[in-house]
Amino acid sequence: MARNKPLAKKLRLAKAAKQNRRVPVWVIVKTNRKVMTHPKRRHWRRTKLKE
């Protein structure tokens, strides 16, 4: 990936990085472990973003 990125691409990558987090612990506790997995979780090597 280029060091000099266009701002729009940088913002898209930042949004994807923020979305790619685990389910918060308080949600797991509140739902009695019914909600454990995050369906939109993305692994950097397996699933690539559209750029």
UniProtKB/Swiss-Prot annotation:
GO terms for biological process: translation. Keywords: Ribonucleoprotein, Ribosomal protein. GO terms for cellular component: cytosolic large ribosomal subunit. It holds the Pfam family Ribosomal_L39. PROSITE patterns: RIBOSOMAL_L39E (PS00051). One of its GO terms (molecular function) is structural constituent of ribosome. It comes from the Archaea. InterPro entries: Ribosomal_eL39, Ribosomal_eL39_CS, Ribosomal_eL39_dom_sf. Belongs to the eukaryotic ribosomal protein eL39 family. HAMAP family: Ribosomal_eL39. This is Large ribosomal subunit protein eL39. It comes from Thermococcus gammatolerans (strain DSM 15229 / JCM 11827 / EJ3).
